[in-house]
Design a protein with these regions (language model features):
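Alpha-helical transmembrane segments and their immediate juxtamembrane cytosolic regions
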Residues: 1-252
Length: 252
C-alpha cells in the first residue's frame, strides 16, 4: 500500500480508484483482525484461523496492499524517503509488540516489507523500466510463484518442490528478513523480502502497463467513503488493533 495515502497525483490528476481499493482492503483488514481476536484470542472458535476461506481472506488483504504499493510507487517523488519512514513505522510496531506481547511480537512485518521494497525498487527503477511493462509484470509473478515456499527451504512451483536449498541459509537468524528464517524464528506478522518484493514489482509494472495502454483514465473515479479511508490507511493500520482490543475488553 502506499500506506500514507499520498503520491497518487500525476499530471494534476488523482487516481481515486487506487485510494478506494486501498480503502476496501483496509476495511477488510480491520474486519479480519476483529474476527481473529474474537475467535482466537477470546476462544469463540479456535479452529477459525485454520479454515481454508480464512486463509484466502487473509492472503487477499496482503496481496492487494502490496500490489497497490508497487503501483503507487510510480507517483512517488521520493520513494527512498517514504521507504525509510515506513521502515521506522515498522520498527515502532516491533518495539510495541515486543513490550506488550512478546510471544506475539512482529518481526519484519508488512510495513518493513513495503518500506524496503520501495527503497530497492526506487534505486533500480531506471533499469527496471528498460523491461517492457507486460514482460516485467509476468516475470515478477513467475518469480513470486517460484520463490513462494522459500521459507520452507525450497524453490518450487505451485507446491511442487523443485530445488532444496542448503540448510546453512536458514542457520542465521539475521537472514530472516530476506526469506530464510531459522527454525526458532517466530513473528506474528512476517513478510520477508523474498518472495513478496516480486509482488511489489508486479504492481510497479502493472501501473506502467496501464499507463502504456491509456487505461489510467478509468482510475480517476472513486468509490465514496472508501477513497477517504484509503488516504488514512497507515494510521488505521497502526491504531486498529489497540482500538479493537480495547473495545473487546469492555464488552466481552
Amino acid at each position: 500500500m502506499n500506506p500514507n495515502g499520498k503520491a497518487l497525483l500525476k499530471e494534476n490528476k488523482r487516481y481515486y480508484l487506487l485510494d478506494s481499493l486501498r480503502g476496501i482492503s483496509t476495511v477488510s483488514m480491520v474486519a479480519f483482525h476483529l474476527c481473529y481476536d474474537i475467535f482466537m484470542m477470546y476462544g469463540l472458535d479456535t479452529s477459525w484461523y485454520f479454515y481454508p476461506m480464512t486463509a484466502v481472506w487473509e492472503r487477499s488483504i496482503c496481496v492487494v496492499f502490496i500490489l497497490l504499493s508497487g503501483m503507487c510507487l510510480n507517483f512517488s517523488e521520493n520513494g527512498i524517503k517514504r521507504g525509510v519512514l515506513l521502515n521506522l513505522a515498522g520498527f515502532a510496531v516491533t518495539c510495541v509488540t515486543v513490550i506488550a506481547e512478546p510471544n506475539q511480537a512482529v518481526w519484519f512485518g508488512v510495513l518493513n516489507l513495503i518500506g524496503c521494497s520501495m527503497m530497492i525498487v526506487s534505486v533500480l527503477s531506471d533499469n527496471l523500466k528498460k523491461i517492457s511493462p507486460l514482460s516485467g509484470a509476468l516475470i515478477s509473478l513467475l518469480l513470486y510463484a517460484v520463490s513462494y515456499d522459500l521459507q520452507k527451504g525450497c524453490v518450487g512451483f505451485f507446491g511442487l518442490d523443485i530445488v532444496k536449498l542448503p540448510d546453512f541459509l536458514y542457520s542465521c537468524k539475521y537472514l530472516a528478513f530476506l526469506g530464510f528464517p531459522s527454525s526458532d524464528f517466530v513473528s506474528a506478522d512476517y513478510f520477508p523480502i523474498i518472495p513478496w518484493i516480486f509482488l511489489f514489482t508486479a504492481g510497479f509494472y502493472l501501473w506502467n502497463f496501464i499507463a502504456q495502454k491509456n487505461l489510467a483514465k478509468y482510475f480517476e473515479s472513486k468509490i465514496p467513503l472508501f477513497d477517504k479511508i484509503g488516504k488514512y490507511s497507515l494510521w488505521i493500520y497502526l491504531a486498529h488493533q489497540p482500538v479493537i482490543m480495547g473495545v473487546l475488553m469492555l464488552i466481552m
